């Protein structure tokens, strides 16, 4: 009898085993980590928020930052998804602050609702001032321009009125001389007699009138 020699399995020639320590494996791990990090908040921002509640000499390890980073990101996704469902039911495309507060209340975080409402009101007031500030400045400029224009119009009208008054005065003085002006200033230089000459020409008539009054 001939013994059959067992066939040696040398593996499939088309399949290559990957070594965990190879450069390609490290590249794949880095790509996966980058994709995972894209879903999270920036770890620098998370670290700054965490340091605000620590003493000045307090320190935070890297794994603590990464843990909080993942938890916060998942929480944000959770709340945003609930608010998004509400907007879809109401056929709206934009999630607003009221939707976020509604989602937090629905998910059972009632203790956070009151401070979030206070923050939302302050935020809206601040943003409203930023938006309205250019409009208010533009309105002030328009009001100043209107006031300046009205002032110029008033000065022009006042000057025009003064010119009209001067014209009327000169016209009256030229065509209607004042009776209180001296004889030398009367505008009739071509007249050949004066009040004195009239008295000289009619002295007798004047005396007769006086005698008739006495008698």
Curated annotation (Swiss-Prot):
Region (Subunit association domain (SAD)): 68-79
GO CC, one annotated term: CCAAT-binding factor complex
Localisation per UniProt entry: Nucleus
Entry keyword annotation includes Glycoprotein: no
Annotation: DNA-binding region: 41-47
Tissue specificity field: Expressed in flowers and green siliques.
A single GO BP: response to heat
Domain of life: Eukaryota
Induction: Repressed by heat and dehydration stress.
Assembly information from the UniProt record: Heterotrimeric transcription factor composed of three components, NF-YA, NF-YB and NF-YC. NF-YB and NF-YC must interact and dimerize for NF-YA association and DNA binding. Binds directly with DPB3-1.
Family classification: Belongs to the NFYB/HAP3 subunit family.
Function: Component of the NF-Y/HAP transcription factor complex. The NF-Y complex stimulates the transcription of various genes by recognizing and binding to a CCAAT motif in promoters.
Protein name, UniProt field: Nuclear transcription factor Y subunit B-7
Organism: Arabidopsis thaliana (Mouse-ear cress)
